[in-house]
A protein has these predicted regions:
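Active-site acidic/histidine proton-transfer and metal-coordination neighborhood
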Residues: 1, 86-196
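N-terminal pre-domain/capping segments
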Residues: 1-112
Length: 197
């Protein structure tokens, strides 16, 4: 994902500072995007996937205002966390097969969003998609395991992603040193083990 052209330029998770994270005002978002476009060190944006569409308010607006030269990534963490509020076993690593299949459907929608961006801007417009090894686990609740995550990874890898890399965004895991994790997804060791297979 690093090229000579990308050195000194960054993928920015600007959505977290957007004036329209929870409400929609097209004018203020346009000002915000135009300011982002003026920053030469921005290589692309980390675009949040909330679970239903490319943009939480207006897909066409995003397609009309995203810089066509940017190389972006789609992060599925926001949508995953939203799902987990009501479906605590939701995720690619879920030991509950129905919840794991629901996560696969979620990622199929994300896959379609990636293709929508690529069809509009070209193949280089989405260089990666961040996935997670949800759901939660600790010493009392064990909703996830490496084998379920591996099964999901194999299914996602069978889709035609082209030049878009599937990237596991490691989140905090339950350990003796971290007995009350915020997310509590799989350990990095289990994630790496699943990826290697």
């Amino acid at each position: 994902m690093v090229s000579e052209n990308s050195l000194g330029r960054y993928i920015v998770g600007a959505y977290a500072t957007s004036p329209n994270l929870v409400t929609w005002d097209e004018k203020s978002e346009l000002i915000y995007f135009n300011l982002l476009k003026k920053i030469p060190s921005i290589r692309g944006l980390e675009l949040p996937f909330w679970g239903e569409s490319l943009h939480p308010f207006d897909d066409q607006w995003l397609l009309s205002n995203l810089d066509s030269k940017w190389e972006n990534v789609l992060t599925c963490v926001p949508g995953t966390m939203k799902y987990l509020e009501t479906v605590p076993r939701f995720g690619l690593a879920s030991v509950d097969d129905n919840s794991r299949k629901e996560a696969i459907r979620f990622y199929r929608i994300a896959f379609n969003c990636v293709n929508n961006l690529k069809n509009h801007f070209g193949n280089k417009s989405v260089i990666g998609i961040y996935i997670t090894s949800s759901p939660y686990q600790n010493d009392q609740k064990n909703y996830a395991d490496r084998e379920s995550f591996l099964m999901s990874l194999l299914e996602l890898a069978s889709w035609e992603w082209g030049n878009t890399n599937i990237l596991v965004e490691h989140c905090d895991a339950f350990t003796k040193e971290n007995p009350n994790p915020q997310k509590g997804f799989l350990s990095i060791e289990n994630e790496i083990s699943a990826i290697k297979q």
